[in-house]
């Protein structure tokens, strides 16, 4: 049995604007798949839990959500083996990387993966540019972060169960469909 923390990052929003928090429906389905396989799961939404905290970022932007210290306390208290970070949109990306950094600061052995629309679309952009000579090939920045071990692309409900089971049993993960990993800077492997 693994302890898995599924976490939604702080929200970068518009100062005095209408800033909405999206329900973590994707994380709920992933959590249920993991629970059905006897894993211990916690979902934590840092933006929702820290909704009253707004940090002025300048340029009419604010960061809404928990402080790094509060996030670190949640991670330490739950003591996960694996952390999954849901990055649905680009306005969550920077905070997602902050969470990954906090996790690895706590314990470098904790597996960290990211998933959601943002990483799936980053892969699509990367694949498009590879097949169109003359276009710049973008880096998949999520995987250029040393604190992120891999990414799940597409629907992760079943992929995540296979991934977690293989991680806790020290088995090869290289053939799991839907995994995206960095090979070297700017080169990625997608199953």
Residue ranges and their predicted role:
Residues 2:
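Nucleotide donor/acceptor-binding cores
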Residues 8-14:
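Short polar catalytic/cofactor-binding loops
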Residues 14-27:
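Glycine- and acidic-residue-enriched helix-capping/strand-helix junction motifs
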Residues 33-34, 40-191:
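Glycine-rich beta-alpha loop elements in corrinoid/cobalamin-binding modules
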């Amino acid at each position: 049995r693994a302890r898995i923390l599924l976490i939604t990052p702080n929200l970068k929003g518009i100062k005095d604007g209408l800033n909405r928090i999206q329900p973590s429906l994707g994380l709920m389905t992933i959590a249920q798949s993991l629970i059905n396989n006897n894993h211990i799961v916690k979902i934590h939404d840092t933006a929702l839990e820290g909704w009253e905290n707004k940090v002025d970022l300048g340029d009419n932007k604010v960061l809404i959500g928990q402080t790094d210290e509060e996030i670190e306390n949640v991670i330490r208290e739950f003591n996960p083996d694996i952390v999954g970070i849901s990055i649905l949109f680009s306005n969550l990306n920077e905070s997602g990387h902050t969470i990954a950094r906090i996790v690895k600061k706590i314990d470098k052995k904790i597996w960290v993966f990211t998933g959601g629309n943002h990483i799936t679309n980053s892969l699509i952009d990367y694949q498009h540019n590879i097949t169109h000579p003359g276009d710049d090939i973008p880096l998949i920045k999520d995987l250029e972060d040393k604190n992120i071990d891999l990414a799940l692309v597409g629907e992760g409900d079943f992929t995540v169960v296979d991934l977690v089971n293989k991680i806790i049993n020290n088995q090869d993960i290289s053939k799991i469909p839907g995994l995206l990993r960095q090979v070297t800077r700017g080169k990625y492997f997608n199953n």
